[in-house]
Structure formats: C-alpha cells, structure tokens
C-alpha cells in the first residue's frame, strides 16, 4: 500500500454503525483499499473536495446515500478516514 490508513475515533463508531445497519461493508473496504493504493475512484463514486468545516477533506459516494469522508497527508503518506454515513448523518441535511 502506498498510504498507511488512520481511522479517527468517530470513523470507528461510524463503521460499526454501518455494520449494524447491514450495509455492504465490502463496498467501503474496496474503496478504502483503492484510496490507500493511491488509485483514482470510478466516476460513479463522485469523489470531490469539501469546503467549510471540512476544508482539506474529500468525500466519495459508496452508494447514493452512503458517504466516506477522508483526507490524504502526503507529507507522511497517511490516508485518514474521518467519517462514513448518510448525508443526514454527516451534514444534518
């Protein structure tokens, strides 16, 4: 892997909640693997940068209403997984 993976405490909680909701964990694991290898995600994942409170982070869609918020720290080659959940879970919308 090109990047080491760092899970925030909140991401760990979100990941457990995703399992409890019976979401297909293999989908998020595959995306995390691609990101850790420095690969671009397919267009269907709608990967894009965030602004405001999430400036410096990126967001991609695992499914239409299941998101992954992450950021790269290229100085130390770390992929930080910040949050996962629905739009309302993450942004209150």
Task: Please tell me what each predicted stretch does.
Residues 2-4, 10-16, 20-26, 30, ...:
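Enriched for short, Lys/Arg-rich terminal
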Residues 33-61:
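A short, surface-exposed loop/turn module that caps and links secondary-structure elements
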